[in-house]
Amino acid sequence: IQYQIIILPAAQKSLSKLPKKMQLRIQGAITTLASNPLPPVTKKLVGRDTYRLRTSDYRIVYEIQNNILTVTVISIGHRREVYRHN
């Protein structure tokens, strides 16, 4: 089953500000979510219906809508700051 990936504009903006090498790494991680939205390294965020995927010092925060097979990337950022904006 393939999930559709939606990246919210704020997450896309954050991604575009990162170094090119990190952008490619994060884009690769996001792409893998289409075939497996809950890889073993994913953690559910406490008190929210969102998950986080670690990529080096950066985090991808996303939610899964299983009923419509969609993964929505909410935010992308450095581990120190990504949780503050949600």
Language-model-detected regions and their locations in the chain:
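Enriched for short, Lys/Arg-rich terminal
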Residues: 1-6, 10-24, 54-55, 63-86
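A short, surface-exposed loop/turn module that caps and links secondary-structure elements
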Residues: 29-54
